From Swiss-Prot:
Biased composition (Basic and acidic residues): 1-11, 119-153
Entry keywords, A to Z: Coiled coil
One GO biological process term: maturation of 5.8S rRNA
Coiled-coil region(s): 53-84
One cellular component (GO) term of this entry: preribosome, large subunit precursor
A Pfam family that the UniProt record links to this protein: Rrp15p
Zinc in keyword set: no
Listed name of the protein: RRP15-like protein
Chain residue ranges for the region called Disordered: 1-52, 119-191
Biased amino acid composition, Acidic residues: 166-191
Family: Belongs to the RRP15 family.
Key word Coiled coil present: yes
PANTHER family associated with the record: RRP15-LIKE PROTEIN
Length: 191
């Protein structure tokens, strides 16, 4: 056997060219198709096998921000903080929340005291022996439409405030207090 008669196989990647396929299918000038025979045929001994190209995945390039972009990002963050678009941090605002809760509790106590005083005066006025006309006038006088907020602030508010101060006994009416003046009293109704 000579080296001319041996078949040779050439493998290439990504050969989508139509011209190469036509050359492969023609098989040479001798008119024989396929590889040459062992008995010494004069056909094209080269046969090319093509495989489809495998696309290689490109690594994502991590883009580093330029100094201008970093400063812009930082200024946007500061702007959001100024607009209070940041979620509140409970751990840092604990003292502030405690003071707000204390003020709200005092306000609720004052409101309930004022409501109970108003109901008491209204029931006392209705219980008196009156004619139907006098009762109607008394109800109109205590109706919410004729409610005088200035008179309420002058009279009812002071009485309610005294009761709250009686519970507090520290005299803390300011929001800014030091840590040594923190009131740990329980203002809930469960006592």
């Amino acid at each position: 056997m000579s080296t001319k008669n041996r078949d040779r196989l050439v493998v290439t990647e990504d050969s989508d060219d139509d011209n190469e396929r036509e050359e492969m299918s023609s098989g040479g000038e001798s008119g024989e198709e396929g590889p040459s025979s062992v008995d010494g045929g004069a056909g094209d001994a080269d046969e090319t096998v093509a495989f489809p190209a495998i696309e290689r995945r490109k690594k994502k390039v991590i883009k580093k921000l330029t100094k201008k972009e970093q400063s812009l990002k930082k200024s946007v963050k500061e702007y959001r903080i100024k607009l209070a678009l940041v979620k509140p941090d409970i751990t840092t605002d604990r003292e502030k929340e405690r003071n707000l809760r204390r003020v709200a509790t005092k306000g609720v106590v004052q409101l309930f005291n004022a409501v109970s005083d108003r109901q008491k005066t209204m029931s006392d006025a209705v219980k008196e022996k009156m004619t139907a006309r006098e009762r109607r006038e008394a109800r109109q006088r205590f109706d919410g439409k004729n409610f005088d907020s200035d008179r309420f602030a002058d009279s009812g508010y002071v009485g309610a405030k005294k009761e709250v101060k009686g519970e507090d006994d520290d005299g803390e009416d300011q929001m800014d207090i030091g840590e040594e003046q923190i009131d740990t009293g329980n203002y809930s109704d469960e006592d």
